[in-house]
């Protein structure tokens, strides 16, 4: 037994030595290959997130750069293809003429009438419209007194193509009893609820949704608010050379048609002045739309913005008309014209300027829009007294403002 123990002991000691050597060898290998994980295993776990984050950021930046580059290439391809399509659709090759003879194209082609959009409205417009044009007025019972004054002025002038879109049953009955052409819409809860509102701003926003079908059917539409008196037939005073032809909120040639406005920043020293172009807004209560794609797109854009973000319809109307394309936004490519501010007259022009000028008082405007004043009905009646019945002092009792 003693001899056997003596023989086994050297082997056991040798095995232990070999195991130690193998362990040291593996430790050295691990130290060389993965020093952080081996030497500082615990701290590496704690710091793994911070070490990993910059690498992931770099990875995301690299991916973003690749995607941005591909996106730029795709955008260029779309632009090139769009230009090829435009050239293919162009019926004739256009060459620039001599200096002073070149004018851009601003009159877009009209859309092909699509009677399937609303067969019932199509049949009605065939009877009421004149030369494929129609005046459209949206109204509810809350504004009936003003509508009565307007309808009387329309009949007095002899306008035949005038159509009311009643927003409640009471006004529909009024149109029937007064033999006024009207269009009863199909039930639509989204429109019906707002249509019965007493808030004129809410009701006003509906017109952009309602007018779309008129344009789809191929009709030129002259939209009119109810606070307007007609003194002449407006269709004889339209140019029809633009997608949108609108009256202005401006009160003279500068504010209505545009002027330079100087912005002054003294901190910029010698470069302190910057010239800006300004124009007072188009009035969304009286405008003419040709049945073109840009006109329909305008209605769609305004309707979409109002439904998602709300806001005043006139502000949204002008934003889409005038804001240019810029990064993140593609502007509306619609041609536009401002109506003569003294023919299509707003109430500021009438009460602050015209009534105080003996020569200007002799001119007869096409319409008068009481958009600047809250006592609309009384001023509409006074305008009729002055321009129709010849009562020279009919306008004198009113203040310049409301």
From Swiss-Prot:
A motif (DXD motif) lies at residues 225-227. Disruption phenotype: Reduced arabinose content in the insoluble cell wall fraction of meristematic region. Reduced root hair length and content of arabinosylated extensins in root cell walls. Keywords: Cell wall biogenesis/degradation, Glycoprotein, Glycosyltransferase, Golgi apparatus, Membrane, Signal-anchor, Transferase, Transmembrane, Transmembrane helix. The keyword Metal-binding does not apply. Coiled coil: none annotated. One of its GO terms (biological process) is root hair cell development. It is found in: Golgi apparatus membrane. InterPro entries: Nucl-diP-sugar_transferase, Nucleotide-diphossugar_trans, RRA1/2/3. Its EC number is 2.4.2.-. Expressed in leaf meristem and at points of cauline leaf attachments on the primary stem. Expressed at low levels in siliques. It is a single-pass type II membrane protein. The keyword Cell wall biogenesis/degradation applies. One of its GO terms (molecular function) is glycosyltransferase activity. Glycans are attached at residue 253. Its main location: Golgi. Residues 35-402 are lumenal. The chain crosses the membrane at residues 14-34. Residues 1-13 are cytoplasmic. GO terms for cellular component: Golgi membrane. Signal peptide: none annotated. Plays a role in the arabinosylation of cell wall components. Involved in the arabinosylation of extensin proteins in root hair cells. Extensins are structural glycoproteins present in cell walls and its arabinosylation is important for root hair cell development. The conserved DXD motif is involved in enzyme activity. Belongs to the glycosyltransferase 77 family. This is Arabinosyltransferase RRA1. The lineage of its organism: Eukaryota, Viridiplantae, Streptophyta, Embryophyta, Tracheophyta.
């Amino acid at each position: 037994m003693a001899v056997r123990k003596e023989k086994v002991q050297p082997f056991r000691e040798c095995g232990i030595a070999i195991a130690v050597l193998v362990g040291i060898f593996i430790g050295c290998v691990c130290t060389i290959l993965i020093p952080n994980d081996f030497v500082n295993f615990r701290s590496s776990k704690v710091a793994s997130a911070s070490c990993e984050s910059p690498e992931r950021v770099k990875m995301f930046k690299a991916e973003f750069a690749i995607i941005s580059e591909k996106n730029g290439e795709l955008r260029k391809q779309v632009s090139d293809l769009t230009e090829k399509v435009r050239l293919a659709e162009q019926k004739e090759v256009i060459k620039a003429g001599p200096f002073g003879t070149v004018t851009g194209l601003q009159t877009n082609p009209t859309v092909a009438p699509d009677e399937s959009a609303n067969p019932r409205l199509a049949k009605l417009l065939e009877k009421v419209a004149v030369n494929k044009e129609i005046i459209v007025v949206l109204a509810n019972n809350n504004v009936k007194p003003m509508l009565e004054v307007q309808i009387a002025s329309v009949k007095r002038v002899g306008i035949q193509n005038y159509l009311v879109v009643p927003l409640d049953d009471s006004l529909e009955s009024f149109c029937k009893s007064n033999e006024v052409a009207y269009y009863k819409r199909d039930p639509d809860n989204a429109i019906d609820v707002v249509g019965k509102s007493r808030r004129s701003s809410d009701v006003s926003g509906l017109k952009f949704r309602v007018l779309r079908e008129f344009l789809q059917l191929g009709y030129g539409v002259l939209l009119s608010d109810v606070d307007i008196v007609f003194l002449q037939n407006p269709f004889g005073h339209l140019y029809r050379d633009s997608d949108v032809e609108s009256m202005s909120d401006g009160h003279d040639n500068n504010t209505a048609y545009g002027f330079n406005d100087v912005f002054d920043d003294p901190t910029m020293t010698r470069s302190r002045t910057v010239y800006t172009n300004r124009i007072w807004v188009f009035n969304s209560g009286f405008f003419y739309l040709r049945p073109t794609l840009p006109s329909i797109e305008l209605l769609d854009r305004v309707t979409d913005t109002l439904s998602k973000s709300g806001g005043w319809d006139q502000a949204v109307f002008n934003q889409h008309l005038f804001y240019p394309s810029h990064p993140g936004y593609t502007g509306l490519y619609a041609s536009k014209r401002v109506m003569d501010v003294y023919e299509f007259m707003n109430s500021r022009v009438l009460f602050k300027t015209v009534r105080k000028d003996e020569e200007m008082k002799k001119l007869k405007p096409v319409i008068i829009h009481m958009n600047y004043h809250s006592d609309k009905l009384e001023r509409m009646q006074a305008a009729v007294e002055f321009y129709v019945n010849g009562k020279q002092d009919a306008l004198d009792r009113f203040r310049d403002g409301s």
